[in-house]
Amino acid sequence: MTLPVGRRTVRAAWITFDRGRDIMKFYSDPEVLAFARRHDLALVMPHQCPAKDAPGDDMDMDPRHGIGRALFTALEQFATASGHPELSNTKLILLGFSGTGALFAHFVGFASDRVVASVVTNPGHFDPVGIDNVQLSPVARLVPQLIMVGGADRVSGTQRPYDYFRRYYEQGAPWAFVVQNKTPHCCIINTKTFMLGWLDAIIRLRQPSSSKTLRSVDDRRGQKLVIRTCLSDVRDTWGTPTWDVCGAGTQASGATLADGMIPAGWLPSALLAERWRAFVTQPTHETTSLP
């Protein structure tokens, strides 16, 4: 754990779950540290068993089976050791990749009252704890989620994460969907600038505090996102083709979708929506952090 806040009261803990060296960069990145200092966040990075060739089986990503309780126990221990008692019941920002992306989608249903926001990247895991089996209550689906995928992801693909997004977005979830065109199962550090902008907006809306209930998000204001997709020649673990974004924009709430466009979520401001559009329409993204 890192405490950029010093002796100030921690408003929330940003949990970045180790799933390879790319996602681990978030924990020590100077811009992330500055962001945490500005918003009075603690940074926590649980380590996991190796994703490949793990002793025994891979992690069980259902937080009800131990990992959720273990995280809360760790925060209670940090509260005592650090002199920050507020950590014992602090609110959480979640960031996970691949299997831990699926974990942090499930986690929202496990402890929705504690979660400020969940960033779910390239989410996927073995059945029955994959992204397609996440079950969220009407309260849990109102927790903001940022769902990110790679257009050339042969592991988790694009369709299953999108189906998860679409199912709950159509039930009123204030979520956003982001595609990194032609990007394989890796390299989410490329999303850092947009991710920090999104988190900044969500933190300001939800006003996390260990002693207060999180504010809800009013998605009647803001921007509705739409995309046009283009199939690639890559297939995921289940044999489903992946896809990239070949067009993106915004539309008025309640408007009929233009031909070929599908929903891609909601963002709280026009500025953030323009940054999203610029990002998802980039032809390619750097892949300098392959695991």
Spans of features found by a protein language model:
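Conserved alpha/beta-hydrolase
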Residues: 39-53
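Short beta-strand element of the alpha/beta-hydrolase
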Residues: 9-20
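Short beta-strand-to-loop junctions in surface cap/lid or active-site-entrance loops
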Residues: 1-10
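The feature captures the conserved acid-bearing segment of alpha/beta-hydrolase catalytic domains
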Residues: 116-196
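Primarily recognizes the serine-hydrolase "nucleophile elbow" in alpha/beta-hydrolase
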Residues: 81-142
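Alpha/beta-hydrolase-fold serine-hydrolase catalytic core, especially in secreted/extracellular enzymes
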Residues: 171-172, 181-291
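Alpha/beta-hydrolase active-site loop
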Residues: 58-86, 94, 106
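The serine-hydrolase catalytic nucleophile loop
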Residues: 24-32, 48
